[in-house]
């Protein structure tokens, strides 16, 4: 049975490499490691998609072309289109409630205030799916709005750490794949 990996992020170029697009960055890295083909439009699911064959079965990666807050629409359409069990869905998302670089793989998790996760849970009618959370932290400076922070780019120091974080995330991803 196929597994559906959903990367949360905003689709426009101006949002590339922002904290809120950590899910997109992680998906790109995982697909590259798996030597998968490039993402291509799948308009019927409102997403960019790529299919990677792996030893644990087909892995369908999607990056919704909706904004973060409407991610659920793409997830429901892709779940139905690829006939994926709810428990075979993994959502890659940024997490302001975790320190930068801290990762968490969990099943049946909450939204932690993340509007993309709220949208997915509401659209699926359940939170019985997997999440791989990528800690982006919170602003250190007073007066910085959280929305501006997550829509901001990673600092130079953070960019230097992304490689080792992606290695750890890849290990957690492999662990998740082996569960089914």
From Swiss-Prot:
One GO MF term attached to the UniProt entry: peptidyl-tRNA hydrolase activity
Active site (UniProt): 20
Discriminates between blocked and unblocked aminoacyl-tRNA, annotated site positions: 10
InterPro entries xrefs: Pept_tRNA_hydro, Pept_tRNA_hydro_CS, Pept_tRNA_hydro_sf
Family annotation (PROSITE patterns): PEPT_TRNA_HYDROL_1, PEPT_TRNA_HYDROL_2
SUPFAM superfamilies linked to this entry: Peptidyl-tRNA hydrolase-like
Entry's Gene Ontology BP terms: protein quality control for misfolded or incompletely synthesized proteins; rescue of stalled ribosome
EC numbers, comma separated: 3.1.1.29
Catalytic class of the enzyme: hydrolase
Location in the cell: Cytoplasm
Highest taxon in the source lineage: Bacteria
Residue positions binding tRNA: 15, 67, 69, 115
Any one GO cellular component localisation term in the record: cytoplasm
A Pfam cross-reference name: Pept_tRNA_hydro
UniProt keywords, alphabetically: Cytoplasm, Hydrolase, RNA-binding, tRNA-binding
Reaction catalysis annotation: an N-acyl-L-alpha-aminoacyl-tRNA + H2O = an N-acyl-L-amino acid + a tRNA + H(+)
Site (Stabilizes the basic form of H active site to accept a proton): 94
Family: Belongs to the PTH family.
UniProt function note: Hydrolyzes ribosome-free peptidyl-tRNAs (with 1 or more amino acids incorporated), which drop off the ribosome during protein synthesis, or as a result of ribosome stalling. Catalyzes the release of premature peptidyl moieties from peptidyl-tRNA molecules trapped in stalled 50S ribosomal subunits, and thus maintains levels of free tRNAs and 50S ribosomes.
Listed HAMAP family: Pept_tRNA_hydro_bact
PANTHER family in alphabetical order: PEPTIDYL-TRNA HYDROLASE
SUBUNIT field: Monomer.
Protein name listed in UniProt: Peptidyl-tRNA hydrolase
Organism: Chlamydia pneumoniae
């Amino acid at each position: 049975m196929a597994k559906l990996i959903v990367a949360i992020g905003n689709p426009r170029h101006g949002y590339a490499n922002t904290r809120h697009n950590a899910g997109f960055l992680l998906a790109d890295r995982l697909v590259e490691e798996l030597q998968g083909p490039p993402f291509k439009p799948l308009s019927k699911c409102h997403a960019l998609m790529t299919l990677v064959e792996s030893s644990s079965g087909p892995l369908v990666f999607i990056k919704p072309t909706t904004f973060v807050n409407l991610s659920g629409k793409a997830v429901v359409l892709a779940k139905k289109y690829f006939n994926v069990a709810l428990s075979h869905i993994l959502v890659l998302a940024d997490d302001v409630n975790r320190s930068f670089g801290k990762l968490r793989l969990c099943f049946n998790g909450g939204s932690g205030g993340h509007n993309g996760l709220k949208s997915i849970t509401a659209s699926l009618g359940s939170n019985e799916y997997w999440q791989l959370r990528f800690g982006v932290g919170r602003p250190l400076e007073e007066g910085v709005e959280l929305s501006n922070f997550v829509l901001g780019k990673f600092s130079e120091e953070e960019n230097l750490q992304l490689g080792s974080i992606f290695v750890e995330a890849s290990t957690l991803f492999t662990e998740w794949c082996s569960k089914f």
